[in-house]
């Protein structure tokens, strides 16, 4: 047996031996637009009988965020026994938007106002994954309503929920399964909500970070070792799901599983990522799978579909150079693998639809495995943020109609790149962007930026 075959077999054995929760084909569904995502959220909130757990990066104090929060309060008022917990990032909730000089109010101050007026006990929990937001955030995903999971990388604001003209496109999968829902709720209760390092964000006084320091070390240590608890089966012949999580580079089960998916591939992989900024390990695995003849399609947002992109008619800020930096990464990658790009073995698909933005993440592997995750496949997700994912094993391709429909929807707004020259380079960029990138390269600051953003 060759070393290549051995690596493939070892990786497949790892994936086959993961403990899985069997799924009924009828219990899985997919939504195909941000508008239907918002409608589904509101429906599920209204229908929930005993628990609602929402995990996201943030809940914004805008019209769409208000629709969600007020729906939660209405549900609690109608059913006081309903347990409602929203888990978001502690730091993100207490600052203004990027670029705001001084925030007069924050999301947290809005939560406090609403709770003061309503007084119903909807709990909004802030999770400080690291002491500073720059070095790691709460990036767990998933919304649980009784026994129903709605999994998406989206947060709650006008653009994610398509409140106005613009939308931010994500993935939206529904799974009805008691074991999976219980496991996800148990994880949140045991690892996060019961921790002394988290703080209620809608009480009169929010515990400052200085008072959370001692408990915070324990939280970080625990999250690095945390696992979902459930009774699973080591099966490889039926539709099933494995919940995964990870924080940091050591013993990170989610990162390890992503690598095993790439290393196990024999026919075809599709990767979705909003920012083309791959960790070294992923780049290496991609190089190896291309070398062994696996077809690879990467769907990535055009620089103008990046949530950091600043339109030309708006005042420019340094953070607006990021989408250009990611495009230089993509151009370098396309140049490195030019032969495979031109032969069609490698397909780079740039997503662009009007003024909308792209936030999809995940993988399809060999028409069998599908990874749903908030993991951006970038160094930040690899090393700094706490992440989770749902690995769906579909050996009989029972979800193929849904996956095909989702793919069709995604690829409808993509441009196929067949040559690196189709991508702009530094020389094509506006002068103010060019200066920033050249200066960053000269001081090697671009490496630091790529590692943390």
Regions found by a protein language model. Give the residues of each.
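HKD-type phospholipase D/PLD-like phosphodiesterase module
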Residues: 11-13, 17-47, 62-265, 304-363, ...
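Generic beta-strand/beta-sheet core signal
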Residues: 55, 87, 145, 152, ...
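Gly/serine-rich nucleotide phosphate-binding loop at the start of the catalytic core
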Residues: 58
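Residues at the starts of beta-strands that form the adenosine-phosphate
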Residues: 81-85, 268, 291-297
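C-terminal, well-structured subdomains that either form a transmembrane helix-short loop-helix hairpin
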Residues: 265, 271-286, 359-374
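Short, catalytically relevant binding-site loops at active-site mouths
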Residues: 276-278, 303-306, 378
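Long, C-terminal catalytic modules of enzymes
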Residues: 340-453
């Amino acid at each position: 047996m060759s070393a290549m075959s051995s690596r493939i077999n070892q990786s497949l054995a790892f994936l086959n031996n993961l403990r899985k929760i069997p799924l009924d084909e009828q219990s899985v569904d997919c939504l195909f637009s941000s508008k239907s995502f918002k409608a589904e959220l509101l429906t599920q909130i209204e229908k929930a009988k005993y628990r609602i757990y929402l995990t996201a990066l943030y809940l914004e104090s805008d019209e769409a965020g208000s629709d969600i929060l007020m729906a939660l309060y209405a549900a609690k008022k109608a059913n006081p026994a309903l347990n409602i917990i929203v888990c978001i990032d502690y730091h993100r909730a207490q600052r203004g938007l990027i670029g705001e000089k001084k925030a007069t109010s924050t999301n947290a101050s809005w939560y406090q106002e609403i709770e003061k007026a309503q007084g119903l006990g909807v709990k909004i929990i802030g999770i400080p994954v690291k002491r500073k937001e720059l070095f790691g955030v709460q990036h767990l995903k998933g919304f649980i309503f009784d026994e129903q999971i709605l999994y998406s990388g989206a947060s709650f604001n006008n653009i994610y929920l398509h409140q106005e003209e613009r939308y931010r496109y994500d993935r939206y999968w529904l799974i009805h399964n008691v074991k999976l829902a219980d496991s996800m709720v148990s994880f949140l209760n045991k690892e996060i909500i019961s921790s002394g390092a988290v703080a209620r964000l809608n009480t009169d006084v929010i515990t400052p970070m200085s008072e959370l320091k001692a408990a915070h070390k324990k939280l970080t240590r625990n999250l690095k070792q945390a696992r979902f608890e459930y009774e699973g089966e080591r099966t490889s012949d039926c539709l099933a799901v494995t919940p995964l999580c990870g924080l940091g580079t050591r013993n990170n089960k989610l990162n390890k599983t992503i690598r095993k998916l790439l290393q196990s591939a024999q026919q075809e992989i599709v990767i979705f990522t909003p920012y083309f900024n791959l960790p070294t390990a992923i780049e290496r695995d991609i190089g190896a799978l291309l070398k062994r003849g696996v077809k690879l399609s990467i769907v990535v947002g055009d620089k103008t579909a990046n949530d950091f992109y600043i339109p030309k008619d708006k005042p420019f800020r340094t953070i607006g150079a990021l989408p250009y930096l990611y495009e230089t990464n993509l151009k370098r990658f396309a140049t490195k693998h030019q032969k495979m790009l031109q032969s069609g073995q490698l397909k780079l698909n740039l997503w662009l639809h009007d003024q909308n933005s792209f936030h999809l993440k995940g993988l399809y592997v060999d028409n069998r495995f599908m990874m749903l995750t908030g993991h951006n496949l970038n160094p930040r997700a690899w090393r700094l943020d706490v992440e989770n994912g749902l690995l769906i094993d579909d050996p009989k391709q029972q979800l193929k109609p849904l996956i095909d429909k989702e793919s069709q929807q995604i690829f409808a707004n993509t441009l196929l790149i067949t040559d690196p020259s189709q991508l702009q380079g530094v020389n094509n960029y506006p002068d103010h962007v060019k200066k920033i990138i050249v200066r960053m390269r000269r001081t090697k600051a671009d490496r630091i930026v790529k590692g943390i953003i």
